[in-house]
């Protein structure tokens, strides 16, 4: 597999057991039910962008390498690169936020792979390579019995009259 394999863009091993760090004592009252603060390696700083030394998920160099792999003669404009990097950052942020909400819904203080996996499968129709979904099963339509078919035929026959 090439350098952009299953774990090149999103290293999900970082999400397997991230514990929330208490920011401070939560205030009493209406803010008591606020979302817990989770410290994730490589999250954006004050500027909102990840810096390369903070384990940025998608750097300009990686993006350029990916474009060259698709078409060696293609070159992206600076604005397009910035937009794609911003979209990638927004995607990561939305997935992590939703996964944190799922973990909170499970009444857990630990973000696990299954939280990220559930969100990606249900919202984005994406599967994480290497992680089975033994708990998440798609709904399978039950096969119809002969008795059911006869009842439905009788209903259709009576509604036509």
UniProtKB/Swiss-Prot annotation:
Annotated Pfam families: TFIID_20kDa
Sites of Phosphoserine modification: 51
Magnesium keyword on record: no
Tissues where the protein occurs: Ubiquitous.
Self-association and partners: Component of the TFIID basal transcription factor complex, composed of TATA-box-binding protein TBP, and a number of TBP-associated factors (TAFs), including TAF1, TAF2, TAF3, TAF4, TAF5, TAF6, TAF7, TAF8, TAF9, TAF10, TAF11, TAF12 and TAF13. Component of the TATA-binding protein-free TAF complex (TFTC), the PCAF histone acetylase complex and the STAGA transcription coactivator-HAT complex. Component of the PCAF complex, at least composed of TADA2L/ADA2, TADA3L/ADA3, TAF5L/PAF65-beta, SUPT3H, TAF6L, TAF9, TAF10, TAF12 and TRRAP.
A single GO molecular function term of this UniProt record: protein heterodimerization activity
Chain spans, region Disordered: 15-55
Keyword Transmembrane helix: no
Localization (cell): Nucleus
Function recorded in the entry: The TFIID basal transcription factor complex plays a major role in the initiation of RNA polymerase II (Pol II)-dependent transcription. TFIID recognizes and binds promoters with or without a TATA box via its subunit TBP, a TATA-box-binding protein, and promotes assembly of the pre-initiation complex (PIC). The TFIID complex consists of TBP and TBP-associated factors (TAFs), including TAF1, TAF2, TAF3, TAF4, TAF5, TAF6, TAF7, TAF8, TAF9, TAF10, TAF11, TAF12 and TAF13.
SUPFAM superfamilies on file: Histone-fold
GO biological process, one term: mRNA transcription by RNA polymerase II
Protein name: Transcription initiation factor TFIID subunit 12
Domain Histone-fold: from-to ranges: 59-126
Keywords, sorted A to Z: Isopeptide bond, Nucleus, Phosphoprotein, Transcription, Transcription regulation, Ubl conjugation
GO cellular component, one term: SAGA complex
């Amino acid at each position: 597999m090439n350098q952009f394999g299953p774990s090149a863009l999103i290293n999900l091993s970082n999400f397997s057991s991230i514990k929330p760090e208490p920011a401070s004592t939560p205030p009493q009252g209406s803010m008591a039910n606020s979302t817990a603060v989770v410290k994730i390696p490589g999250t954006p700083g004050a500027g909102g962008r990840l810096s390369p030394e903070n384990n940025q998920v998608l750097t300009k160099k990686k993006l350029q390498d990916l474009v060259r792999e698709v078409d060696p003669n293609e070159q992206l404009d600076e604005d397009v690169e910035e937009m794609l990097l911003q979209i990638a950052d927004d995607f990561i942020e939305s997935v992590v936020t939703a996964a944190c909400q799922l973990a909170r819904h499970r009444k857990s203080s630990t973000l696990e792979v299954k939280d990220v996996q559930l969100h990606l499968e249900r919202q984005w129709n994406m599967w994480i390579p290497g992680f089975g979904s033994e708990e998440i099963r798609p709904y399978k339509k039950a096969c119809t019995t002969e008795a059911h078919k006869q009842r439905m035929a009788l209903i259709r026959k009576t509604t036509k009259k």
